[in-house]
């Protein structure tokens, strides 16, 4: 199986949506790994109250959020498919009966990098 996707996640998503099996497998593996780590942290913390999707993929990729939450359904995670269709808007996307609140929280990664860089430059003087 040949992977014909670049490293940019939206290209991977587009490939998966166009039927590229390798891209679909890579996306599924990504979602599985995210859910695995959330599950591990939930076990270590004796449960979670909130699951937050943020940054480029988390705040914009409807399919990733749906797949990750489906993997976590054993914990009572339930999302509203209509609300999950939103991108880049701060909001709760879980259903009222979900045992875990699921949020989308936008971030400005470039601004954070610029602020951290400015702090490092100041500290180096």
What residue ranges belong to the model's regions?
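Glycine-rich phosphate-binding/hydrolytic loop that grips phosphoryl groups
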Residues: 80, 84-124
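Adenine-nucleotide phosphate-binding core of ATP-dependent small-molecule kinases
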Residues: 2-5, 9-44
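Active-site proximal loops enriched in glycine and acidic residues that flank catalytic Cys/His/Asp
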Residues: 16, 27, 52-57, 106, ...
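Glycine-rich phosphate-binding loops at beta-strand->alpha-helix junctions
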Residues: 49-71
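Alpha-helical scaffold segments in soluble metabolic enzymes
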Residues: 11, 40, 67, 116-119
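Short, glycine-/Ser/Thr-/acidic-enriched flexible segments
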Residues: 8, 58-59, 109, 119
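A glycine-rich helix N-cap at a beta->alpha junction
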Residues: 71-77
């Amino acid at each position: 199986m040949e992977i014909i996707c670049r490293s940019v996640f939206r290209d991977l998503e587009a490939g998966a949506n166009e039927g590229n099996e390798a891209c679909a497998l890579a996306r599924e593996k990504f979602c599985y790994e995210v859910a695995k780590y959330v599950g591990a942290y939930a076990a270590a913390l004796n449960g979670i109250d909130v699951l937050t999707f943020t940054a480029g993929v988390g705040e914009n990729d409807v399919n990733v959020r749906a797949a990750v939450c489906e993997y976590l359904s054993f914990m009572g995670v339930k999302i509203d498919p209509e609300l999950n269709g939103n991108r880049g808007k701060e909001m709760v996307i879980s259903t009222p009966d979900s045992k875990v609140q699921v949020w989308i929280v936008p971030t400005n990664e470039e601004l954070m990098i610029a602020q951290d860089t400015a702090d490092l430059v100041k500290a180096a003087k």
